[in-house]
Amino acid sequence: MEYSGMKEIVWGVWKERENMNADMKWLDNPEVFKVNQLESHSDHCYYLDYSDMKKEKNPLLQSLNGQWEFAYSKNVMERPVDFYKETFDASGFDKIMVPGHIELAGYDKIRYINTMYPWEGKEYHRGAYSMEATGAEEGMFSEAQYNPVGSYIKYFDLDRSMCGKRIHICFEGVEEAMYLWLNGQFIGYAEDSFTPSEFDLTPYIKEKGNVLAVQVHKMSTAAFLEDQDFFRFFGIFRNVTLKALPDVHLEDVWFKPVLNQDNVSGRVSTSMKVSAPDSQHVTACFILKDREENVLVEKSIQLTKENGHMEGTICADLENVKLWDNHNPYLYHAYVELKAEDGSLAEVIPYDIGFRRIEIIDKVVYLNGKRLIITGVNRHEWNARTGRCIGIEDMKADISCMLRNNINSVRTCHYPDQIPWYYMCDDAGIYVMAETNLESHGSFQKLGAIEPSCNVPGSI
């Protein structure tokens, strides 16, 4: 079965790269930061029907959190090269819990660094293409004497509810560079410690007896950009989840609620990108409800094929809009229903949205036409025992602490937080300044002292 939106983006990639091997030189190359990684998309949940939304566990998701096999190596040269093969004997491996930091499991060393790069004083590194590099970038991480490697293996069977569907895997956070294999086949490579990395496993996954192998490297060229003022860890420190995709699936969605200048009326547009079998005609229905579950909007369109996907946008106007702010964080319940050609429900997507308008007038910030007074804090994801590997209860405790102390805003210093945090802030009425994973002051502190091409983008 061929799918709009999958044939070109996924199947075509696999046909071209099915014999590709993992290359350790990617660690040294700033132009290679992902291989076979799927496109980023919205953070929505999806279900086969409304009844699944009420279940404790979504039948389309399977967590791989828990105990994994593990081996620690000081550098690339000492790593177990063939550990990803199905015939590999991992009896000599240790056990490690995922998610978690490798350092807090008893390996390597815990380090806190502010403005320096972690290799300074030990090895000479300059960013690729800088005039001072003179070839130093060749092998600077793949051949470094100190660049620890964590080799993980997970054995698993696919849940019955997942069988027969397209299967993706999502790593919500891996610090700092990762290689991925399934059943002996190379799947992909990714950098960026604080955003999800998603890969398609469909061509190689089995119902039973799967061997998933992940190799995590503490440093790569991404380290030039991830020079935050914090503890330096590595490993799989956020959730790992298998995702089963229905035949008709919402790949990406953008809800855009707009509050008009009268602060009474509003408009919401919902843009969708859907994958479906090429022969399918798909209808999308947008439903908006208030807190009391009264239906305010219900509109449908037939999606059209655009750029290899099924796409469409639904717009709706509202009157007597209830506003969102920190005093009354009112959220509406939005739903997208995708229906197959015979009218049957193929997938349902719930999402809460709010109406608010932010403006800057004469250097003053206004929210919904009123001056906004911000009482905010910087917040790291942090637990005194588990580091940046935190859970829902840690987030709830932070929200509770902020509300008790009349704090109405938070800055996610210095990286994207786990996705549930943003939902919690919506619910609690917390304004969010969301930072990207970019801090390179290890280069700008030398500004004027060395040749300026050494300064990494983002530092000046």
What are these regions (language model features)?
Residues 237-253, 355-370:
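Low-complexity, Pro/Ser/Thr- and charge-rich linker/hinge segments at domain boundaries
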Residues 213-215, 333-337:
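Extracellular recognition modules
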Residues 68, 184, 240, 332, ...:
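Conserved, mostly hydrophobic/aromatic
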Residues 180-182, 265-303, 312:
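Beta-strand-rich binding/interaction modules
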